[in-house]
Amino acid sequence: KNYYKIDSGSSTTNADMKLTGAYMLAKYGYSENLSLGLTLGGNKSEAKLSMSKVKGNSGYLGAFAENYRGNLTLKAGAGVQYSEYDANRSTLGGHSYSDKYSDMTYDIYLNGRYSNPIGDNLFLESYATLSYTYVDQDGANEGSKALAIDTDSQSFEYTVGKVGVDLKKVIPHEKGKSTLSAGVSYTRIFDGADEEHITGRFKGGSDFDILVGHKNEHSVGVNAKYALELENGVIFDVKGSYSVERDSHNGSGKNKAKGEWIAGAGMGYKF
């Protein structure tokens, strides 16, 4: 952190993130207007920067409830995720460091979706989601090498809202039905987008601040999905989305927009 306002120039850092995961969802019709469900999932992640790389494994467990009020579906849920990471850092001087650390993530969310019929098996669906996430991250210890860094544990909080609209077409056929949908969405980080600092220190040295860059508050996205539901209970779907953030600035940095692709496929059985 530049306490003395020295002109220290600028630098550009590029980061690429890859996430691969799977999840299982179970839902039980508790009553005519209420369903209860569980979500169990896991993923592998890999983040690459110019001089470092972090690989992670995560497991997620969540529960939710859905309430049906005519064309309106209300959903509330909560979950917890445990993640472990292997981090590797290199320096221009040829030194390399590694460490393992973990974090716990807790989230709660509320969602509402209204389905408005506008034609023959054609629906215009609008939705809104509000979520709160709390992350408790362990400190890091790179060992006893020269210029190895220790960091303190740190917590982060985010409050995020999302609104969107989908156009959905249901196509009945002899052995079940197919559903095609496509839409647009807007996401806003209400709280937690500002830059933060993690306290670190070289071995035997004094404390210094490590910058956690600010986040882009606004993003827009498009999505598409195809789902097949057969009379024998088999369910299959494929979906994809693309989102892009607006370039954002603060007093010490700029986040340049970078698109994000998400693709997925699922298969299940409906009892």
Role assignments for model-derived ranges:
Residues 1-116, 241, 246-255, 260-266:
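Outer membrane beta-barrel translocator domains of Type V secretion systems
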Residues 9-14, 50-52, 84-102, 136-157, ...:
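Solvent-exposed, glycine/polar-rich loop segments of beta-barrel outer-membrane systems
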Residues 36, 62, 66-67, 151-271:
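Outer membrane beta-barrel transmembrane domains
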Residues 43-44, 131-133, 185-189:
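Short, internal active-site loops enriched in acidic
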Residues 47, 74, 85, 121, ...:
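Intrinsically disordered, low-complexity acidic/polar segments
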Residues 77, 125-126, 180-183:
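Beta-strand segments within the central parallel beta-sheet cores of soluble alpha/beta enzyme folds
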Residues 109-139:
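Transmembrane beta-strand segments of outer-membrane beta-barrel domains in Gram-negative
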